[in-house]
């Protein structure tokens, strides 16, 4: 006997009051930003304060709401408890490096220390991620929703706490082995290197990053919403993403399938052909993910831009589509 399918809505996320971090991700062009903005609008109805944060360098939040956002959180016009910000992790790390150089412009050791620190793959992005998380945590939002970069970047982003923990462990070992040598060279060159400060700062991050890592792996606090369309490549990408999320021990139990042609009575030949293809892949999604909430969102007649259009669209995530 087959199990009753789970409700095809994201209402389960609104009801899970313990959730702190929600990631929304998928392939480019599947409606990921529209979905994350809409989810944030719904979440703001049941939470005290919500932050929507884009880690996608394309930064579509500003376009979606028709308001310019930057790296500082600011309220979205029309809301009292929903804020947004757009950050570029790569730009964040560049700022950190420039700051370090300004503090020690004539220190030949600082370049060497940076090279040593960034010799570990992924450490630059991971450090930038640590800075972002530190800032976000200090703002004390009730719930944080990440509109992530297209799939590949998303998964790297989620693995950063692990990368950083491993990197800090390696760097701690390097400090004990090469610290005296660097200090000796520093003395010979007549410079006052801040290598101890650099390592101390990184070591200081370890505790908070370890805490973030634990939170990301806790299904009571963190979940990932997959967004796709009912086509082969998108389905393949979603399957790969779910497998990787599972390997990172990150909870995922919601899939939003966008741009569906749900009207069976259409007379348009192209629509009939496309609907037939969509139904084929939708059946596969339902078969593969029977323990997921699969939200079927229809193709809407106009572009979803602006607060009013997003608010209207957000209802489709909570109330299953019914043909009028």
Swiss-Prot record:
Residues involved in ATP binding: 27-34, 231, 258
Listed InterPro entries: Anion-transp_ATPase-like_dom, ATPase_ArsA/GET3, ATPase_ArsA/GET3_euk, P-loop_NTPase
What's the top EC group for this one? hydrolase
Presence of keyword Nucleotide-binding: yes
Where found?
Cytoplasm; Endoplasmic reticulum
What is this protein for, i.e. what is its function? ATPase required for the post-translational delivery of tail-anchored (TA) proteins to the endoplasmic reticulum. Recognizes and selectively binds the transmembrane domain of TA proteins in the cytosol. This complex then targets to the endoplasmic reticulum by membrane-bound receptors, where the tail-anchored protein is released for insertion. This process is regulated by ATP binding and hydrolysis. ATP binding drives the homodimer towards the closed dimer state, facilitating recognition of newly synthesized TA membrane proteins. ATP hydrolysis is required for insertion.
A Gene Ontology molecular function term for this protein is: metal ion binding
What Enzyme Commission number(s) does the record list for this chain? Answer: 3.6.-.-
**Pfam families, sorted:** ArsA_ATPase
Q: What is this protein called?
A: ATPase get3
What keyword terms does UniProt attach to this protein? ATP-binding, Cytoplasm, Endoplasmic reticulum, Hydrolase, Metal-binding, Nucleotide-binding, Transport, Zinc
Q: Name one GO biological process term.
A: tail-anchored membrane protein insertion into ER membrane
Which GO CC terms are listed, alphabetically? Answer: GET complex
Tell me the domain of life. Answer: Eukaryota
Q: List the active site.
A: 56
Species of origin reads Schizosaccharomyces japonicus (strain yFS275 / FY16936) (Fission yeast)
Give the multimer and partner information.
Answer: Homodimer.
Q: Which residue windows are coiled coil?
A: none
Tell me which family the UniProt entry assigns to this protein.
Answer: Belongs to the arsA ATPase family.
Q: Where does Zn(2+) bind?
A: 268, 271
List the top taxonomic levels of the source: Eukaryota, Fungi, Dikarya, Ascomycota, Taphrinomycotina
